[in-house]
A protein has these predicted regions:
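Basic/aromatic-rich interaction segments and small domains that mediate binding to polyanionic partners
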Residues: 29-64
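Intrinsically disordered, low-complexity, charged/polar segments
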Residues: 2-7, 51-76
Length: 76
């Protein structure tokens, strides 16, 4: 079952996101992003970059740091 409301979507650590998950933006919107590829931390400050697509097919990139949380609507 997927969450429909941005406020109700669980906040999880970026390391728990997987390809195929549906995530939200940092601010409250109705935009849903399907993760297509993930760039994980290599060295230095730990960051995760998610390469995703919205429902209109537009590609988007979001970067989250170690202390950030990601809102996940649906798990892959």
């Amino acid at each position: 079952m997927s969450t429909q409301n941005w406020c109700e979507a669980p906040e999880i650590h970026p390391s728990q996101i997987r390809v195929g998950d549906v995530i939200g933006t940092r601010r409250p919107t109705d935009l849903r992003l399907t993760v297509k590829m993930i760039s994980g931390p290599q060295s230095g400050p730990r960051q995760w970059t998610f390469f995703s697509r919205d429902e209109h097919g537009q590609q988007r990139t979001s970067t989250f740091a170690e202390d950030d949380v990601v809102r996940r609507y649906a798990k892959a």
